[in-house]
UniProtKB/Swiss-Prot annotation:
GO cellular component, as recorded: cytoplasm
SUPFAM superfamilies: Ribulose-phoshate binding barrel
Species of origin: Shewanella sp. (strain ANA-3)
NCBIfam families: hisF
Lineage: Bacteria, Pseudomonadati, Pseudomonadota, Gammaproteobacteria, Alteromonadales
Nucleus keyword on record: no
GO biological process, any: L-histidine biosynthetic process
Active site: D11, D130
Oligomer status and interactors: Heterodimer of HisH and HisF.
Protein name: Imidazole glycerol phosphate synthase subunit HisF
Keywords associated with the record: Amino-acid biosynthesis, Cytoplasm, Histidine biosynthesis, Lyase
Length: 257
């Protein structure tokens, strides 16, 4: 059995790490490189960095901090933010990123996924999906440009359909960002993640809702995800990554120590 992964997420805005609740009201939580180094030292399996306003503001993730992170940590990391071309992706990988993630740009141009996969291989292409549960229609819908509240818009895609589409086009992993759960620390959306797991033949990373160690256990056991991403519980030192891994191992979950 492949070991499950613990993945701290660092949302970046104006050169700082920030965190919001349900993708709104972001507050500064720290500097990029020291936080990355701290999580690597605690035992994170990899890191994800989102330049959250890049796509909405039509720019690409800032490469200067990418190279500084690469110099300081020895675990894989993924970067996202406004990546729309092969050249932009190549530059970020050259600066030290191990994977690149695309979200809003892929919704604008789905062919970007297959072009990136053809150029760099499936293994380093991650697709982020911002999924919102719409109670009125009892359905999961994909939103775009979520890093800027004023620019956020609903797309024509239902989450399940987009999950299938991005796999057909060649993505290597999917991060499902459950917007309703984001930052509230009430637990992962097991129901939605389990539904997506049935459709997902590539590694699936759960994002949104972690508040306790049991939430991590439950999402691994019940939704059978490959990795669990979290932000605020790590930023605010509510959960220590090393202690979390010891707990999960004691619960019988295969985890890298």
């Amino acid at each position: 059995m492949l070991a499950k992964r613990i993945v701290p997420c660092l949302d970046v805005k104006d050169g700082c790490v920030v965190k919001g609740v349900q993708f709104r009201n972001h507050e500064i939580v720290g500097d990029i490189v020291p936080l990355a180094a701290r999580y690597a030292a605690e035992g994170a399996d990899e890191l994800v960095f989102y330049d959250i306003t890049a796509s909405a503001h039509d720019r690409v993730v800032d490469k200067s901090w990418v190279s500084r992170v690469a110099e300081q940590i020895d675990i894989p990391f993924c970067v996202a933010g406004g990546i729309k071309t092969i050249g932009q992706a190549r530059e970020l990988l050259a600066f030290g990123a191990d994977k690149i993630s695309v979200n809003s740009p892929a919704l604008s141009d789905p062919s970007l996924i297959s072009r990136l996969q053809d150029e760099f291989g499936r293994q380093c292409i991650v697709i982020g999906i911002d999924s919102f549960y719409d109670a009125a229609s009892d359905s999961y819908k994909v939103k775009q440009f979520t890093g800027d509240e004023a620019a956020t818009k609903e797309t024509a895609w239902y989450t399940q359909d987009w999950v299938e589409e991005v796999q057909k086009r060649g993505c290597g992993e999917i991060v499902l960002n459950v917007m309703n759960q984001d930052g509230v620390r009430g637990g992962y959306d097991i129901k939605q993640l389990s539904l997506v797991r049935q459709l997902c033949d590539v590694p699936l990373i759960a994002s949104g809702g972690a508040g306790t160690m049991t939430h991590f256990r439950d999402v691994f056991i019940e939704a059978k995800v490959d990795a669990a991403l979290a932000a605020s519980v790590f930023h605010k030192a509510i959960i220590n990554i090393g202690e979390l891994k010891q707990y999960l191992a004691a619960e019988g979950i295969a985890i890298r120590q």
